[in-house]
A protein has these predicted regions:
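Mid-to-C-terminal alpha-helical segments outside catalytic/metal-binding sites
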Residues: 2-37, 46, 57-78, 242-243, ...
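Mid-domain alpha/beta scaffold segments of enzyme catalytic cores
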Residues: 21-153, 157-161, 199-202, 235
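Active-site metal-binding loops of divalent metal-dependent hydrolases
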Residues: 39, 84, 194, 258-259
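N-terminal cationic-hydrophobic initiation segments that often serve targeting/anchoring roles
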Residues: 71, 98-102, 181-182, 212, ...
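Short beta-strand segments
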Residues: 81-83, 110, 220-223, 254-256, ...
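Hydrophobic packing residues within well-ordered alpha-helices of enzyme cores
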Residues: 94, 177-180, 275
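Catalytic pocket-lining loop regions of alpha/beta-barrel enzymes
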Residues: 132, 145-254
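Short Gly/Pro-enriched loop/turn and capping motifs at secondary-structure junctions
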Residues: 224-226, 259-262
């Protein structure tokens, strides 16, 4: 198991997640249903044990019931639950959550990318109810498996199953995805969090823009609050969104809160309002795509 995959943000925020209170905003109800393309859920419960490698698990629970309250307060109707890395490949809590609260949630699972059985595991998890798989190749040598022989079978299996490949990786790794995308022309590929491109390295974003030549690549508009060096509404990070919007169009951008990771920096309400209210270069139709219709393309919400 590649321990370098365990991104520091996904482990470090457990204690921070209560740092910023969330409040219900004032907003106009849109004519479309708002879809959050990524959250995580977890619970401290012996029925769902933490992975052995998770040395400092979050002490505060972050459950679907808690999320539903935020969704209702902010006018969000559907959400994608991505498997929390603290459970590694044990996807049961995410699966039980999407089943319990159907049809509100859809789920994205994790499989071990260095396990030759990963494609078959993905098939099984898809049959059980997941729609998508997430991988996280690290920037260092520990993430070099992205260029290894086990990746094409996993990507091709996702393509044959008709489920998206979700990739959370730093901007320096983005060029490594091109050969896999080219091998799977009918696979939807979702790049998480704008690849966390630093705002002080705008030329690095060219690597992400280069993937716009592939028509099934989608970009999550998220993590503005962590890459930004400014207060809300994070205008320096908005410049990344502006450039991605010019390259991909709104039809291939989709919003995600990344709750509860966001709570270490901001609120769920602001993670949404920055797109809905404060990106002045977006018109109403653009927002309907980024906040709703693009996600509908990737995840078949009922």
């Amino acid at each position: 198991m590649d321990r370098s995959m365990m991104n520091r943000r996904e482990f470090a925020f457990g204690a921070m997640a209560m740092a910023v209170p969330d409040t219900a905003p004032k907003y106009r109800v849109p004519k479309y249903r708002v879809i959050d393309a990524q959250v995580h859920v977890w619970i401290n419960d012996p029925r769902y044990p933490w992975a052995r490698e998770t040395k400092d698990p979050p002490k505060e629970n972050r459950t679907p019931a808690m999320l539903l309250e935020l969704m209702k307060a902010n006018g969000v109707e559907r959400t994608v639950i991505a498997q929390y890395i603290g459970y590694l490949w044990d996807n049961r809590y995410a699966l039980d959550s999407i089943r319990k609260y159907a049809p509100t949630f859809m789920g994205v699972c994790r499989v071990n990318p260095v396990d030759p059985a990963a494609p078959d595991q993905l098939s099984k998890l898809t049959e059980e109810g997941f729609h998508g798989v997430r991988i996280s190749p690290a920037a260092n040598a520990g993430g070099d498996w992205i260029n290894g022989p086990l990746m094409p079978p996993l990507w091709k299996r996702a393509e044959s199953l008709g489920v998206p490949m979700q990739v959370y990786t730093p901007i320096t790794r983005i060029p490594d995805l091109a050969h896999l995308i080219e091998q799977c022309p009918n696979l939807n590929v979702v790049i998480d969090h704008m690849a966390d491109c630093p705002v002080d390295q705008p030329r690095e974003l060219d690597k992400l823009i280069a993937l716009s030549r592939y028509p099934r690549v989608y970009i999550k508009v998220s993590h503005l609050w962590t890459v930004s060096r400014q207060p809300y509404p994070w205008l320096d990070a908005q410049e990344h969104v502006r450039r991605l919007y010019a390259a991909y169009g709104p039809q291939r951008l989709l919003w995600a809160s990344d709750w509860p990771v966001d709570l270490g920096w901001t609120t769920y309400a602001r993670a949404l309002s920055v797109v809905r209210d404060d990106m002045k270069f977006l018109n109403a139709e653009d927002k309907s795509w980024i906040l709703s219709m693009t996600a509908e393309r990737v995840w078949p919400f009922p």
